[in-house]
Amino acid sequence: MKAAPPTSLQALIEALRVLPGVGPKSAQRMAYHLLQHDREGARKLGDALRGAADHIRHCARCNTFTEQEICETCLDDRRDGSILCVVETPADQIMIEQTLTYRGKYFVLMGRLSPLDGIGPKEIHLDRLLARATDTEMGGPVGEVIVATNFTSEGEATAHYIGEMLKARGLKVSRLARGVPVGGELEYVDAGTIARAVMDRRNL
């Protein structure tokens, strides 16, 4: 009879597999490492995951992660409310913030269009983006929307869809310049390249 890990250990391995890029073997190595070498780290990890899952929500205006109803960026009156930058993920938002060149507001899609995966306009909250860009109660109307989706095929398709949707409402829409490589994702691009792409953005 084949020996199996204890039930609680197997549950940990399966839980670790939800992480991107983590397969069965990687999850098993992580689980064994935590239990063999870093029990205190394992407890801290569990507490941090539980705390984040219980307290992190989506900002009512920009859809990013926050512990409040409205995030600090949206509440910051020093930022330029006439410019709205649309990104795929909170990680992309952080990358643009690190350039120290953009002082407008954001909207975070939490994804990108991918019909083959069942991800359409509703799943990436384009109805909320439209409201954010045009509704005065949500902080609109804005003077310009910068589409900063990634330069993957899905990101380009998402940018095109957003551009057509917002231009139909009379809004100015621009796209990051091609300083970001084709197929590139903002999360993995250096801050200087992103800064140049923002400054050299082009109209859609």
From Swiss-Prot:
ATP-binding recorded as keyword: no
Domain Toprim: 82-181
Database matches in SMART domains: TOPRIM
Keyword tags: DNA damage, DNA recombination, DNA repair, Metal-binding, Zinc, Zinc-finger
GO molecular function per UniProt: DNA binding; zinc ion binding
GO annotation (BP), single: DNA recombination
SUPFAM superfamilies the record matches: Recombination protein RecR
A Pfam family recorded for this sequence: RecR_ZnF
Zinc finger residue extent: C4-type: 59-74
Family statement: Belongs to the RecR family.
Function in brief: May play a role in DNA repair. It seems to be involved in an RecBC-independent recombinational process of DNA repair. It may act with RecF and RecO.
Name by which UniProt lists this protein: Recombination protein RecR
Organism of derivation: Cupriavidus pinatubonensis (strain JMP 134 / LMG 1197) (Cupriavidus necator (strain JMP 134))
Gene: recR
